């Protein structure tokens, strides 16, 4: 991937959607819910504060994160799906 996010943006590779229910039934594509977690694959340099100071990013590449259902912008690069979102759209880091 050759994407480099700007400012306080983060690129996330969403986790794959569930294929089956707990009971073993296959879920059709129209019934699948989008996952709300994924892995950070790139981060921008940070946000510039009003006083001109660069604020460091709190997330780093490789971290698993939890984000909102409608967070980010979906993009497809080289056949792979990604989300580009602001760091503030991330709710938590999963350990």
From Swiss-Prot:
Gene Ontology biological-process entries: chaperone cofactor-dependent protein refolding
Subcellular location, record wording: Cytoplasm
Keywords associated with the record: Chaperone, Cytoplasm
Coiled-coil features, chain-numbered ranges: none
Oligomer and partners: Heptamer of 7 subunits arranged in a ring. Interacts with the chaperonin GroEL.
PANTHER family noted in UniProt: 10 KDA HEAT SHOCK PROTEIN (PTHR10772), CO-CHAPERONIN GROES (PTHR10772:SF58)
Family: Belongs to the GroES chaperonin family.
The protein's name: Co-chaperonin GroES
Lineage: Bacteria, Pseudomonadati, Chlorobiota, Chlorobiia, Chlorobiales
């Amino acid at each position: 991937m050759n994407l480099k996010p700007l400012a306080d943006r983060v690129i996330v590779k969403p986790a794959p959607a569930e294929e089956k229910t707990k009971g073993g039934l296959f879920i059709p594509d129209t019934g699948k819910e989008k996952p709300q977690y994924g892995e950070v694959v790139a981060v921008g340099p940070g946000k510039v504060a009003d006083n001109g100071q660069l604020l460091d990013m709190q997330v780093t590449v490789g971290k698993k994160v939890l984000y909102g259902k409608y967070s980010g912008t979906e993009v497809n690069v080289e056949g792979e799906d990604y989300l580009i979102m602001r760091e503030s759209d991330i709710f938590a880091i999963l350990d």
